[in-house]
């Protein structure tokens, strides 16, 4: 129980001003935060990847072929390029290259769990650069029709303590799984078997900070505009492979997870969390809203400060 009490202080709005906390809880309680988070320009995207910086610009990729880019991280426009179409990508800079993961899948909703997660590299994310060229994608995770997991919704983490590269994937229709990739090739580590780390969520993202691994997942239903019930939940663990536990001691493998981002009166369906470091001491989180009532009910990119 001692560990659970400590965890509660991290995520409880009651003690947030005294203890280390995730800012999402505080932001949700402030109507002014809803205004501040609104990106401008044409921030229209679904299932955005973690935001990556390249040559002074910001990039994020979404479901379908393409994404958004920005000069300042605030005003966004279309023009990011990602071949392969597919769903729910993620991107991570490793050394001087960018690793992009995406899914080609049935997605579970129609009864099929068949799918693949693929990875590919690029030296740059700027499509105007002479160095812009994606490598041939390789399959790193798969699921079959009768499997209790969907190979979709990739999330990448390069562990800063070990240098090991991890991929989480899966949907609400089965387990969230974790596999290890080779950070030099982006391929699945030979002999590596997937580990089940959560259920009842999708669009997972992993964070490491100060001895803890945080698993962010998206709970609820998607893809139904203003009727979407997406919300973002979190648990944490001392080990990358779990168990991930929420503030009241529930394991995410048993359906637990502390809600940290929910809908508000102007936007519904927050999902697909990503965290990026702007500079030392400055962190931000990105996600989408399934429907922004002030922008014709479209799915939009949202960015907030992430305070600890």
Region locations from a protein language model:
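Bacterial N-terminal signal peptides
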Residues: 19-31
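Carbohydrate-active catalytic/glycan-binding domains of CAZyme proteins
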Residues: 36-308
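Secreted/periplasmic carbohydrate-active enzymes, especially glycoside hydrolases
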Residues: 1-2, 35
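Glycine-centered signal
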Residues: 13-15, 31-35
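Hydrophobic residues within membrane-embedded alpha helices
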Residues: 10-12, 27, 42
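Bacterial N-terminal signal peptides that target proteins for export
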Residues: 3-22
């Amino acid at each position: 129980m001692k560990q659970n009490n400590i965890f509660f202080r991290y995520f409880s709005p009651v003690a947030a001003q005294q203890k280390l906390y995730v800012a999402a809880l505080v932001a949700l309680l402030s109507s002014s935060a809803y205004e501040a988070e609104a990106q401008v320009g044409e921030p229209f995207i679904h299932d955005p990847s973690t935001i990556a910086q390249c040559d002074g610009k910001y990039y994020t990729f979404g479901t379908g072929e393409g994404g958004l880019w920005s000069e300042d991280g605030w005003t966004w426009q279309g023009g990011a390029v990602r071949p392969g179409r597919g769903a729910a990508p993620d991107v991570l800079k490793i050394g001087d290259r960018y690793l992009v993961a995406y899914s080609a899948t049935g997605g579970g909703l129609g009864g099929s769990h068949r799918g693949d997660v693929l990875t590919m590299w690029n030296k740059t994310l700027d499509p105007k650069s002479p160095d812009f060229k994606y490598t041939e994608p390789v399959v790193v995770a798969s699921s079959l029709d009768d499997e209790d997991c969907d190979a979709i919704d990739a999330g990448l983490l390069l562990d800063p303590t070990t240098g090991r590269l991890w991929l989480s994937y899966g949907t609400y229709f089965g387990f969230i799984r974790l596999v290890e990739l080779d950070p030099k090739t982006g391929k699945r580590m030979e002999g590596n078997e997937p580990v089940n780390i959560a259920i009842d969520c999708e669009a997972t993202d992993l964070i490491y900070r100060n001895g803890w691994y945080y698993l962010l997942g998206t709970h609820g239903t998607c893809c139904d505009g203003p009727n979407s019930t997406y919300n973002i939940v979190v648990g944490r663990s001392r080990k990358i492979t779990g168990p991930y536990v929420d503030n009241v001691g529930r394991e995410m493998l048993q359906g637990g997870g502390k809600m940290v981002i929910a809908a508000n009166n102007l936007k519904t369906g927050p999902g697909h969390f990503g965290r990026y470091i702007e500079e030392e001491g400055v962190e931000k989180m990105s996600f989408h809203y399934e429907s922004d009532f002030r922008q014709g009910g479209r799915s939009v990119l949202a960015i907030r400060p992430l305070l600890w």
